[in-house]
Amino acid sequence: MERRNITDSPMEIYIHIPFCIKKCDYCDFLSGPSGPKEQADYVDALLEEINAAEEGKGRSVSSVFIGGGTPSVLDERFIGEILNHIRRKFQIADHAEITIEVNPGTADRNKLQAYRTYGINRLSIGLQSPDDRELKILGRIHNYEQFLETYRSAREAGFDNINIDLMSAIPDQTYEGWIHNLRTVAGLDPEHNSAYSRIIEEGTPFASRTLNLPDEDAEYNMYEATAQILREYGFEQYEISNYAKKGRECRHNVGYWIRQDYLGFGLGASSLYGKERFANTQDMKKYLENSRTPEKIREKEPPLTREDEMAEFMFLGLRMTRGISKAEFERQFGSEIDAIYGDVLRKYKSMRLLLEENGRIFLSREGIHVSNSVMADFLP
């Protein structure tokens, strides 16, 4: 069995900014409104956590992702300070992918130009819908015109790698409305689209309402139409919910799916490092008081067993349309995949939910629709 995560292999960094102007009605992420003092105190604690990190010494960092929340609500100088600390502490690779999430109306041209000077080379813009009526249903604070202003400003600032987030199966949304949304956004010619189906999360305003939701057949048709229509505009589906122009796949997310090591900094941020998975506390007070001592804010899981790692290899890798490599499985774990998962693989191949070609195993189109059930069978 080949040892994983040797120190000369690349790793990734995630930075969590838990602030937003207003929490959206469907959102269950660790985020909420804040004032200038809360933001400044948080960034100070974040920088202390970065400085105190023991992991990652000598490792090349292939990607940095600043997410939230809405990172663009921060004054741009804070983003500059965070990236400066990352660069001093870690070895950022040449041509590393550095992404920040931006919501429309929270980043003007000056802020976007500042991001460019800080070395940020990829934007992920949270549009969700180009339909103002749907944006109101979702509780979004922006309208489509504000998105267009942000998008145009990003292009003028020099960003040539932009993702746009879209959401399907929104309350009262029709199949025809979703098709219109896809064509509207694809016509803007971004490099990447993320298209997620709406999920009603417990504890959100959505969960307490009576909503007129598209039925399962409509959701199925919306999903199938997404890949077909985006392909017309030059996008290829490379993951269950992600579509990219050639060579513009989100390298950071691909890193998650191939189990590349990553360190997460900030409130609630999770990490995978070697055989350890751990996450920071979600208690803001505890985080602010203890961030300079990482062990005090981390909530560790038991070390990953070989069975855990094999299961993760399968259910994370199967999220990608290219699936998993049988040879890579054997290289990492020293066993043939059929010796470990033969029964599960035969079961789903016979149902045509899993396919095998050229030494790779991947979900069929029908398999994608029941992917959670398929992937659950690989759990130890």
What are these regions (language model features)?
Residues 14-16:
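Short active-site neighborhood of thiol/selenol oxidoreductases, capturing the structured segment around
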Residues 18-29:
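Local cysteine-cluster metal-coordination motifs and their immediate loop/turn environment
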Residues 335-347:
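Short amphipathic alpha-helical interaction segments
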Residues 349-359:
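A short, conserved structural fragment
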Residues 360-364:
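Minor-groove-contacting beta-hairpin "wing" of winged helix-turn-helix DNA-binding domains
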